[in-house]
């Protein structure tokens, strides 16, 4: 049975929810998060306080772009699966701070993919976004729809990481699954999301 799973973005809403589920079911989880202040960091610390209550949880706070720390952390943990959920989120913010997105989302994800290949993990799961569908007018969206017309820097970085992942899967036969999330909601959710704002 697979026991060791590396989760990036473990202080984020989806990362926290996944890590908690895995820990509750007996897995060993190592979380990796830079604790970005894109929204209230107190919420991220509160989520992590719950995770730290599990003896099978360990954590590294750093940037995905810090290849040396990332390499050492993953190599020492020796995960069978990597779930890459960390990213600089926010479509509007990407217009104001595009370089942040290029660095975090593209360079950070490339580092994860390269390490997954180097360590020959059983599976790499990467979070993408519904924003890659861009100007696509087909409704409802389908996995096979064209994704060449992104409308924001955020979406473009997500599409770029999908392309890098596809190339590694093709060249090295690295098992990769990409998840295109739409609006995700629930307990401990992000305060900047529409549903959270509506309830307020």
Locations of the language-model features?
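N-terminal Rossmann-like NAD(P)+-binding domain of SDR-like oxidoreductases, especially those catalyzing
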Residues: 1-184
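Glycine/proline-rich active-site loop of Rossmann-fold NAD(P)-dependent oxidoreductases
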Residues: 159, 184-197
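Alpha-helical substrate-binding/gating segment
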Residues: 170, 196-200
């Amino acid at each position: 049975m697979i026991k060791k799973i590396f989760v990036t973005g473990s202080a984020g809403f989806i990362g926290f929810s996944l890590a908690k589920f895995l820990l509750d079911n007996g897995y060993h989880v190592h979380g990796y998060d830079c604790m970005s202040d894109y929204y209230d960091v107190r919420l991220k610390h509160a989520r992590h306080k719950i995770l730290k209550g599990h003896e099978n949880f360990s954590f590294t706070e750093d940037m995905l772009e810090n290849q040396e720390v990332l390499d050492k952390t993953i190599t020492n943990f020796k995960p069978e699966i990597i779930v890459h959920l960390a990213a600089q989120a926010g479509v509007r913010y990407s217009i104001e701070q595009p370089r942040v997105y290029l660095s975090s989302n593209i360079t950070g994800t490339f580092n994860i993919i390269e390490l997954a290949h180097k360590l020959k993990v059983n599976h790499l799961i990467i979070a993408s976004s519904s924003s890659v569908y861009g100007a696509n007018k087909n409704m409802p969206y389908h996995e096979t729809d064209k994704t060449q017309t992104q409308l924001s820097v955020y979406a473009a970085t997500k599409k770029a990481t999908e392309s890098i992942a596809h190339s590694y899967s093709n060249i090295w036969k690295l098992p990769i699954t990409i998840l295109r999330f739409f609006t995700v909601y629930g307990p401990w959710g992000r305060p900047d999301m529409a549903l959270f704002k509506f309830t307020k």
